[in-house]
């Protein structure tokens, strides 16, 4: 699962909890992504700036491709949500070359993209 998928999973979990509340005014918009081309360098003359707005937070990242800019900005949003304590009960796992197809991923403490699953 990547950071964009984690944001979507968090959004769906929040929507489910909002539907269970009696108020009709609760609605959480899905993560919104905005792209604009920016001046790059010689190797990548055009880079992409991705801005994400989600749940009172916003983040901006600039990378060579739209996909990598989107993932980097989603990572920043996930860090903000984690710092606020909103990602409790959510986990993020990546498949690495060290894991087999049917096994779990090995935890690498040097990576910052693993969130611990909490109750």
From Swiss-Prot:
Annotated keywords: Apoptosis, G0/G1 host cell cycle checkpoint dysregulation by virus, Host mitochondrion, Host nucleus, Host-virus interaction, Modulation of host cell apoptosis by virus, Modulation of host cell cycle by virus, RNA-binding
Any one Gene Ontology cellular component term annotated for this protein: host cell mitochondrion
Primary localisation category: host cell
Gene3D superfamilies documented for this protein: 3.30.160.20
CDD domains in the cross-refs: DSRM_SF
Signal peptide, first to last residue: none
GO MF term set: RNA binding
Domain called DRBM: residue spans: 2-83
Protein's organism: Bat coronavirus HKU4 (BtCoV)
Subunit structure: Interacts with host RUNX1 isoform b.
Function: Induces host cell G0/G1 arrest and apoptosis.
Protein name, UniProt field: Non-structural protein 3b
One Gene Ontology term from the biological process aspect of the record: symbiont-mediated perturbation of host cell cycle progression
UniProt xrefs under InterPro entries: dsRBD_dom
């Amino acid at each position: 699962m990547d950071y964009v998928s984690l944001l979507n999973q968090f959004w769906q979990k929040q929507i489910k909890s909002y539907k269970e509340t009696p108020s009709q005014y609760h609605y959480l918009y899905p993560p919104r992504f905005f792209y604009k081309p920016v001046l790059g360098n010689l190797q990548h003359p055009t880079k992409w700036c991705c801005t994400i707005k989600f749940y009172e937070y916003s983040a901006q990242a600039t990378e060579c491709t739209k996909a990598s800019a989107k993932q980097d900005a989603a990572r920043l949003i996930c860090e903000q949500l984690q710092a606020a304590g909103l990602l409790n009960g959510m986990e993020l796992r990546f498949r690495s070359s060290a894991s087999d197809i049917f096994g779990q991923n090995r935890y690498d403490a040097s990576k910052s993209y693993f969130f611990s699953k909490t109750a």
